[in-house]
């Protein structure tokens, strides 16, 4: 979940910043010089949309390291760390990808993989997961993350996010132009976009960006089933992954720190933004899979 949430939040921030920079550079004035030029706007939206998604992908690994406080295992300090590195190496060889960077971070049971390229990725696990699972279950979780990398999920999500960004940028400026035209009705002395346009587009870039995140999260939930199946294939059997999922389902997630408690998402709205399907559905999918 960390992998996709970080990508989505980074993407929203990048697109919003690019939108502000474009405004400061006078791009919006060009787009609205003689009414709203929809063809030019579409080209601008494509560049902004996919540009924002690609930038988010390229910085995903350093952002993940910083935000999660990942400590890379460059030189294993004990037998457990050596086992984690060797397990990741073995699974990566099976999946035919380059050896990822391996890291550990403090926190509740969790793990993630990220990175722009299959042969230059990062796999990280939390101390809570290492303390609460058997080695077989940990291996299954690592296999799940390796499967994400091997399946090219970050690139796939980037393409999906790029399409959604394009719609966000295009719609926000069309709506912003309509709002600005309404507010300045009868004002024949003004030229170029007004304050209504700039405020509307900045706000809509953020609001529609989160709406687009619902679609991205829906695709992410479907990719999780593939990663579960990939882990089972790498392990040679389904039971370890099923056991790991059952263990995760029975673990109590850590409480949110007070500083970010207001950003916690629960209930029906939370389900729309959920990047992972319910544990029960994932276990059932593995049970029903052939092999």
UniProtKB/Swiss-Prot annotation:
The active site is at 145. The chain crosses the membrane at residues 4-24, 39-59, 159-179, 199-219. One of its GO terms (molecular function) is zinc ion binding. Binds 1 zinc ion per subunit. GO terms for cellular component: plasma membrane. One of its GO terms (biological process) is proteolysis. HAMAP family: Pept_M48_protease_HtpX. This is Protease HtpX homolog. It comes from Polaromonas naphthalenivorans (strain CJ2).
